[in-house]
Design a protein with these regions (language model features):
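N-terminal leader/linker segments that precede catalytic domains of diphosphate-processing enzymes
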Residues: 2-258
């Protein structure tokens, strides 16, 4: 069984190198410095129906600089305001240890909040919880997904998050991220889907056929990871010690688990 899985993984790596990465990851000019990574977070949302499991994906605008036209999970770059958000439910302590933030609870919470905030901004969907006396952020420069939530009396519900994995953009890209992928069950969501300038199409796609869409290798990898577990969030939660880190080294995809 173990040998079979290893063979499957090697086959997947070779296929992904040819099909995905070259299309959606920009290349830096030769002899330029390697770009520093920026912290980012995505929220993978799954919906279970009687027949199948579906995943929420959005199509990026063709006008965007990074991965134009690719289908992605909602998410984005960590913002300074994500550190200022009060009154959230607690993120699982075991997840904090997996995020590579030196067990810094504030940094871990900020990443989790970023995934929820970006999802609100890009899709209109909210992973939130009603709270009494919600504190609004007294900063005129902050007008984002968390502001939208606070006006509805909601706070980010970090307790509903499950950790899927992380990824680092390869060094040959001029735009690089250290992304953490959280996930949650759609039954916990509030709000309605609405397209934005960033995601011009948003759909619930059957998990088993989702990789047929144009997407980056890391998105495909994470979807295949979900398929391995049949989209079972509770099972993935129990298998926390086996979460992947996805990157590229020496021109090849590099996947570690610990």
């Amino acid at each position: 069984m173990k040998k079979h899985k290893i063979m499957q993984q090697k086959k997947y790596i070779a296929r992904s190198m040819v099909k995905k990465e070259l299309k959606f990851t920009p290349k830096k000019e030769k002899d330029t410095k390697i770009a520093r990574t920026r912290d980012a977070a995505s929220l993978v949302l799954l919906k279970k129906t009687r027949k199948e499991v579906k995943v929420l994906l959005g199509k990026r605008s063709e006008k965007t600089r990074f991965m134009p036209g690719a289908w992605v999970f909602p998410g984005g770059v960590l913002d300074k305001s994500d550190y200022k958000i009060p009154e959230t439910t607690k993120l699982n302590n075991n997840i904090i240890q997996k995020l590579v933030v030196s067990n810094n609870v504030q940094a871990a919470n900020a990443l989790a909040i970023a995934s929820i905030r970006e999802t609100v901004e890009e899709t209109g969907l909210i992973l939130g919880k009603k709270a009494k006396n919600v504190s609004h952020i007294n900063d005129e420069n902050i007008n984002n997904g968390i502001t939208i939530m606070s006006k509805k009396g909601l706070v980010p519900d970090l307790a509903k998050l499950v950790y899927l994995g992380r990824a680092i953009t390869p060094t040959f890209s001029p735009i690089r991220f250290h992304a953490r992928f959280f996930m949650a069950d759609a039954k916990h969501l509030l709000g309605k889907i609405k397209t934005t300038s960033e995601l011009v199409e948003i759909k619930w796609i059957p998990l088993k056929t989702a990789t047929k869409l144009p997407m980056a290798d890391v998105t495909e990898f994470m979807i295949n990871e979900l398929i391995e577990y049949n989209g079972d969030i509770s099972l993935i939660k129990r298998k926390l010690e086996n979460r992947p880190m996805f990157t590229w080294k020496m021109g090849k995809q590099w996947i570690t688990r610990k």
